[in-house]
Amino acid sequence: MCRNKLRKCDPRPILHLLIYLLFIYATLLVIHTIFGRLFIGNHAVKIKRSATLPLRFNSQGTFKILQVADMHFANGVMSRCRDVLPFEFHYCTDLNTSDFFRRIVREERPDFIAFTAIESKIPWAAILGNHDQESTMTREELMTYLSAMDYSVSQVNPVTYGYSDGEKKVREIDGFGNYNIEVSGAIGSELANMSILNLYFLDSGDRSTVPGIRGYGWIRETQQIWLRQISEMIKDKQRAGPAPDTHRPPSLAFFHIPIPEVRQLWFTKFVGQFQEGVACPTYNSGVLNTLINMGDVKAVFLGHDHTNDFCGELNGIWFCYGGGFGYHGYGKAGWHRRVRVILAELERGERNWKGVHRIKTWKRLDDGSLSKIDELVLWTNPLST
C-alpha cells in the first residue's frame, strides 16, 4: 500500500489481496457446485441455485409455459389419493403426483413452469392459493421461502411508490406474491434485449377479511393500481425500444381464485369441461375492467375449481382453468388429472425472429400416453405478416 504520495506505490499487496479474494470465491463456487450448501458451525447453509435471467424465447422462436394448478401435495407416500377409481386407490399417493410432474416435464420440455419445478432446473414461479397458509407459515413467510428456493423467480411483493402530500412514499400492496416477469426476445434478434412477453402474477387471497362480506378473497385495488402502473411502464419501454411501431407486447396473467365474471362463460362456446360451479368471491372488485383497460393481457390462467378445465372468452380476454393436477386434492373418479401447456410463438422475419406472433394452449392428461387435448389459439398478432 502507498501512504506517502511522494513515494512510488507498491502494487503487490493489492494484487495479493485480489488473488486471495479470487481464491476464496473459487473455493466457495466449487463447494456449492459439488455439495449445493456450505457449513457454518454445525449448521448447513444452502446457497440458492439461481435461474438464468432474463427469461427469453429459445432458438426455435418459442417460449413454453407449464401451468401446474392445484397440486395439493401433502405428505408423500403417506397421503392417499382422492376421487380415483376403486382399483387405483390402494397404491395411489402423492407419489403419483410427483411421477406425473416428471413425465410431463420430460414430454413437453417447458421453458418456464408456473407453480414449482426445482428438480428439473427449469425457472419457475408460484402464486398462493386459498389453502397454502393453513399450516404453520403465514402467506408472507411462504412467499419469502418460495422466492429463496432453487431456480425460483418468485417474488414476495414489488417495491412501488406513490405520493402523499407531495412526498414520495413506499406504497403498500395487498397480499403476497404480486410480481411480473418479462420474457426477452430470441438471442441474435433485434429484440434480444427487449421484453416481448410479460407475465403477471397476483395473490388472489384466501377468505374475505372484510366485515359483512363472506366467501373467498379477491384482488384488491392496490394490486390493480400496481398492475396498471406496470402495464404503462412496459408500454413506455416499448416506445423507447428498437421497434416502437410494432404491436404492443402481449401479457398473460396468473392467479388462483376466479373472478365473478367467469360464471358467465357457461353461456358461451367455451372449450373444455365446465363440471362444477365457479367458486369465486361474492364481491366484484373490478378486475375484469382493469384488465380490459390495460389492453395488453390476452389470457388469464386460473386454478381453484379442480374439475373445471375450460377456456372461455370475456371481452377479448381468455380465461382458462388449469384443471386439477394433484392426486391428494379433490377430483373426479375416472377423470384424469391434467396440466395446461401455454406456447408463445415468434414471427419469423427475413433474417431473424421478430415479436410474438401467436399464443396457443392445450392440456395433457395423466393417462398412459399423456394424451394432448383441446388445442386452442388464444391470440394472434394482428400485425403479423
Language-model segments: what does each one mean?
Residues 109-112, 192-194, 198-201, 209-312:
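His/acidic metal-ligating clusters that form di-metal
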